[in-house]
UniProtKB/Swiss-Prot annotation:
Gene3D superfamilies: N-(1-d-carboxylethyl)-l-norvaline Dehydrogenase, domain 2, NAD(P)-binding Rossmann-like Domain. This is Glycerol-3-phosphate dehydrogenase [NAD(P)+]. Pfam families: NAD_Gly3P_dh_C, NAD_Gly3P_dh_N. The lineage of its organism: Bacteria, Pseudomonadati, Thermodesulfobacteriota, Desulfovibrionia, Desulfovibrionales. The active site is at 202 (proton acceptor). It is found in: Cytoplasm. It catalyses: sn-glycerol 3-phosphate + NAD(+) = dihydroxyacetone phosphate + NADH + H(+); sn-glycerol 3-phosphate + NADP(+) = dihydroxyacetone phosphate + NADPH + H(+). Catalyzes the reduction of the glycolytic intermediate dihydroxyacetone phosphate (DHAP) to sn-glycerol 3-phosphate (G3P), the key precursor for phospholipid synthesis.
Amino acid sequence: MSNPQSIVVLGGGSWGTAVAHLLATGGHKVHLVLRSQKLADYINMHHENNIYLPGFSIHPAIHAVTGKISFLTKEPAHVLAKATIVILSVPCQSLRPVLQELEPLLTKNCILVNTAKGIEVETLKTVEQMILDEMAHRVSHYAVLSGPSFAEEVMCEKPTAVVLACRNEQLGEHLREIFSTPWFRTYSSTDVTGVELGGATKNVIAIAAGVSDGLGFGINTRVALMTRGLAETTRLGKALGASPLTFSGLSGLGDLFLTCSGELSRNRQVGLRLGKGELLKNITNSMNMIAEGIKTTYAVNTLASKLNVDMPITKAVYNVLEGVISPHEAVQKLLCRQLRNESLDETQPIWTDIP
């Protein structure tokens, strides 16, 4: 086991809670920072996150804390000042103001590990790029943890494999030891861009896969969407400097397969319900956890257009979310695209008939 660390997990959703449990199981001192005082009190008393992970026992060594208004107040500020590692488990679209609050509280060598999966809609930036904006001097101490990992299965200690990417290879190897247990295997990588993009775009493709399932199509259709979705994700990754090989790994193909086929996938559930005819507004209003793929679809579609990268499945999901076309029409549009060589790596968009 690695030396015990003082770790703060920001965000008490299902994944933040599961990561906190994982690290506490590994013998580390873990604080879980929430916004809800009621939930923090419940976790400390009952060792259960009854809102986001009901029915699962949380390691009793985890201590939940909260600030009334922001992370800068009272106990959270105290624990952050002593943290050697801070885990960012806040939804991507809400992360930037959290980073701004964090900066003055952290020690010089504090390590930031991101678990959020998305691209900021307003700026089209990844989390690493947000770190560069808000705390550039810390980017050498930044890593991202991603891969096929449902929180519920991590809580049950079912064998899981993920990847941790850090541009500092030595630091990445150090972190993979901290995040590994006999049932949770962590691989290391230096391709931060590729790992972040794989984690973000798979949620878009998962919505498409859910739409297909909701329409009553078969496994053939779902796997076709997954495979071609991986192809367009790889094209975007190459345009942004990522290694194409990363997308065949855990944060690419692995996470894509899990999210497109798993019953626990929130993004697939969004697509499934869209395919069955529900309105997007009604779907989102009924969910108590965020499906990152909705906002990510808008960001990825805009980014692809800006970079002139052909991403027809992403475009189709965007148009369904916008109500431009029906789910069934979107599938038909994809099937009626110009026939081509499978290995063709387009630099020019070839689907231009939908705005």
